[in-house]
Every structure is written in C-alpha cells, then in structure tokens.
C-alpha cells in the first residue's frame, strides 16, 4: 500500500470522491445538529426560573393554563415555549435514549449495508431522523414518554446512517487518501456541534426553542435530496465520474486483499486482539465525548453564570477546534504515509494515543481550575479538539485491517462507544441529582 505513487494522480480536491466527502460532511453535520438540538433546547424547556412562578406545572407536559397567571406576559412565556418539569434523572434518560436507539441498529445496518449497498439505507436513516426532529416539539407536549420514544427511534435511524458510510469508503477511498476523505466527512459532526451550540441559543431566544428542531429538521430534508442525487455505492456505477478517476480508484483498491465471500468470520474477529484494541478505544473515546457533548451547555451556563445565548456560543468554541483538528489530523496522517515517514501501524497508534491521552489530561485538570474563566474555556476547547485526533487513529483502522467488513466492524465499534455513552450520560444525570450542582 505504501509503494504506489500512482495513487497520487489527478486533481484530488476537484475529484468526485472529494465531492462525496463533502456530501457526507453535510449529512454528518445534519445528524449531529439534530442529536444535540435537545441539549440546547432543554435549557429553555426546563427553565427553572420560569418554573418557580408556575404552581400548577405538569410533570410530563407543558403548563396548560400559564396565561391565566397575570404576572407572566405573552412575550415572556407562550405555548411555543412551554416549560416542563423534568428532573435531572429524567433529562439523563432522555439524553441517553437516542444512544439506545443507535445501538439497536449499528451492527445489523453495518452488515446489511455491506450486502445490499449503503446509499438507500443511509438516505432512509437520514430522512427518518429529520422527520422525527420536526416532530419533537409536538412530542414534548404529549409527555416525556413520547419524547423518549421519538429519540429512541431517531437513534435507530441515525445508527443506520452512521455505520454504512464505511461501506462507501471501502469502495471509494484509495488507501493513501483514506485519512483525508474520512476526516473531511467525519468533521461534519464537529462542525455541526459548533453550529448548533453557537446558534441554537440565539434561535431559542429569538424564535423560541421549537424552532431549533424545525430549522435543523428541515436542513436534514434538504440534505436527503443531495444524498439521493449525488451518492452512489461505488465508482463503477456513478454516471458523472471521469474515466481517469474511476481507473485511479479501482487500480488502487485492486492491490489490497479482499474476501469474495459474504460470510462474516466471527471466530477470527473474536480472537483478533487489534479489533479489541479498537473496541476499547471507541469505549474510552465515546465516554468522554458524550459527557462533553451532552452536558457542556449546562456546565457552561451554571459554572460561568451566563445566559442561554452566551452559553451556546461558548459551548460551540470547542467544536470548531474539533473540526479543524479532525481535518488537519487526516492531512498529516496521509502525509506521513505517502512520504513513507512512518509505517501505517505507527501512524494509527500515534493518533490514537494522542486522541485519548491529551483530552483526558485536560478533563482531569478542569475541576482544579474552575475558578479561572479563561483557563476553563481553554481546556474545554482542547478536550474535543485533541480528542478528534482519534479519527486518524483507531476510528479509521477497520478500513485498514478488514475493508470488506468495515461497516460491520464499525457498527460493533460504535456499539461499544454508545454503551459508554449510555452509561456516562445516565450516570452523570444521576450524580448531578444526588450531589447537586457543586460548581
């Protein structure tokens, strides 16, 4: 793989495969904004300041007769910005419910995408997630149980859309461009987190919190149109690809080993130590990232005592750093490989180690610098930024060791990660309710 200078032919960034990476970037952008929308909106949905003035609030739905209270004006509180009395434990369950849904579909969707093609499966998952995002404000009016159900099904849809991406890259990404292409696509999640955290609070204040769901749900529907128009399962069947690019991709992929059969070698996978290292990496990575992504707006608003608008803006800063580090890490990884400066295994280990060690050090340091506004913000920026170096490490590693089963293995890997996400978000909500907001 390292000795193929021919894989550098052609105008890389003007090629169709980089166009596909941008479409996947947009789809990942869309899915993460839909996932994080609730983390922003919930600050207004369970606004404790407003709740204190509402004596007849329901535990599962909005305040039905809020307008009967003459001390609350229509401008301050209306049916478009209902307040719900959801405890920290309930919020933790709501946050983690989308992970329950994702984990249900990760493994089967990864396997089926490898057999039947990823285009339809990913597109359907994105469309379902977008429609359920539009439905979320109405679901909240019917009670917390329906919200949990909607988020669970939404997670199932996003699980379909997540894992199949590696099936496409197994057929579209030349080995020496894998880090670049996958990190361009994957950085959409970090950039989406930046956008939703930056503008979500502004939308909530200017238009009321339901519009957070309406705007990003509609964005997902637009993304679906692009997806079904531009994305194809492999370069052989794409009507717009040039002959030169098609030959470049096919010739580079022809030199890597492949398995002709569809049977999954489960026994070999179970006994493969590198795979277990990847699974453990996903578990550790998702544990920290889920806590940061889910509770960062609340942490910022309570620790730094800022309003929802400023909380969203501050919470967004770490994720622009994450998007930048993701892309730069991919460029650096492929540079090291293409110049034969480091072996493939060394590059993956290097980026995996940096992506796990550096954010952990920053997270451990946070409680000790809580009194310093500037240092706290710097550490919160560094945590997601350095964590996304993993995208050029173990996260892409399944494409290296088993490209034929990349989506199936990615489903299992994300399953380990989402188990960590479920445990961490639920445990965090429980600890907050028991210990209280000590910060």
Curated annotation (Swiss-Prot):
Pfam families: MFS_1. It is a multi-pass membrane protein. GO terms for biological process: phosphate-containing compound metabolic process; sodium ion transport. One of its GO terms (molecular function) is sodium:phosphate symporter activity. The keyword Aminoacyl-tRNA synthetase does not apply. Keywords: Cell membrane, Glycoprotein, Ion transport, Membrane, Sodium, Sodium transport, Symport, Transmembrane, Transmembrane helix, Transport. The chain crosses the membrane at residues 98-118, 130-150, 183-203, 211-231, 273-293, 317-337, 350-369, 374-396, 415-435. It catalyses: 3 Na(+)(out) + phosphate(out) = 3 Na(+)(in) + phosphate(in); urate(out) + n chloride(in) = urate(in) + n chloride(out). CDD domains: MFS_SLC17. It is found in: Apical cell membrane. Expressed in the small intestine, kidney, spleen and testis. Not detected in fetal brain, bone marrow, and mammary gland. InterPro entries: MFS, MFS_dom, MFS_Na/Anion_cotransporter, MFS_trans_sf. One of its GO terms (cellular component) is membrane. Glycans are attached at residues 47, 56, 68-69. Belongs to the major facilitator superfamily. Sodium/anion cotransporter family. Acts as a membrane potential-dependent organic anion transporter, the transport requires a low concentration of chloride ions. Mediates chloride-dependent transport of urate. Can actively transport inorganic phosphate into cells via Na(+) cotransport. This is Sodium-dependent phosphate transport protein 3. It comes from Homo sapiens (Human). The lineage of its organism: Eukaryota, Metazoa, Chordata, Craniata, Vertebrata.
